[in-house]
Amino acid sequence: MWLTARDCRLDDLIALTSTTTDPATYPRASRITDGVVVYECADLAADASRPSSRLLLQAEIASALMDGPGIAVFAGAFEDASLIDSVSAVFEEIIAEQHRGGGPAGDHFGKPGSNDRIWNALEKLAVRAPDLFVRYYANDVVALASSAWLGPGYQTTSQVNVVNPGGTAQAVHRDYHLGFQPNEVAERFPAHVHDLSPGLTLQGAVAHCDMPVESGPTLYLPHSQRYGLGYLAWRLPEFREYFETHHVQLPLAKGDVVFFNPALFHAAGTNRTTSTRRMANLLQVSSPFGRAMETVDRELVVGSIYDDLRKGHASEGWDPQRIDNVIAASAEGYAFPTNLDRDQPIGGLAPMTQAELVARALAEDWDHATLVAALAAHVERTRTS
């Protein structure tokens, strides 16, 4: 029921990652490279265009992501290189503006400020270049893979990552959701949630330039997504060492797209070139599920109850657990979604939650006005610009 880091055994991961990817399981794939399923998108067009064969193709993709290597490459997903170049030019304009504006630069799993990052690139592209947005996100390979993993109604976000020449590799990790939680938090989620978390998100990347191995395309450990304790294991030294010696790394061409299970052990590689700015548009596609049925103004709720909650906190008769219970019922307990331009993950993987803010207010005995002002500022940071 409950998992702990003490339960992690490297031998269990080794047994899973020693699995051979069987080409017969993926009849529509063009090849298997270093255990990774590779599809030539030109060869998929006929199957993708017919409803019955499209479903079979999607089942194969989902199998590769869940039970197979956990990763699939779609070569030539964007056939029009000029479209990629035009979108890249918009991204470069945004990056140049960010440099002129200064300010802190947060990042996930990498050294802040060492590379270039555009948060909420999807919205920024739509506002700046709606014609390019329409052509770019009309891509059927992105929709094919996203709906294969998540079904209909998914939501797409994107963050552009540019690894500059000399940019160093990320630390191995798993991704959103549980991958963003420290072990002491991840251990509080029951085992079945560890199993369910990968089904809420699909990770992808569009190559916006040719990415030879020396430019540091992403490192992957095929089949590692099947390790049930992986969200607690990836920070452990022996697991990191194993990743460093057993990962695979595939070169990509401009317009290729990679999709992978967010539970796959992976990390961006070191850019050893002197001139290649390795640009990828990182797609994070989310399930329509995982949301509450009703919209609740939690800022209003917390502001309304704070004085009574503060009295309870000050009372010797109140168990601290009961205070935590009230905070859980009233405040937003998750840091996402947020605006990562204003609410950056500096010093960690996730910004402060509203619930953590309320707990701090009680611990420091803030008055009502101070709490209300802090809540308003917190909500403002999370809003899109």
What residue spans do the PLM features occupy?
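Fe(II)/2-oxoglutarate
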Residues: 1-67, 326, 333-337, 344-385
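Non-heme Fe(II)-dependent double-stranded beta-helix
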Residues: 17-183
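Short secondary-structure boundary/capping segments
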Residues: 90-91, 172-177, 220-223, 235, ...
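A structural signal for short, well-ordered beta-strand segments
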Residues: 160, 204-206, 281-285
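Double-stranded beta-helix
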Residues: 185-188, 197-267, 289-292
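A short hydrophobic beta-strand segment most commonly corresponding to one strand
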Residues: 222, 275-291
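Short beta-strand His + acidic residue motifs that chelate non-heme Fe in jelly-roll/DSBH
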Residues: 266-274
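Active-site-adjacent segment of 2-oxoglutarate/Fe(II) JmjC oxygenases
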Residues: 284-337
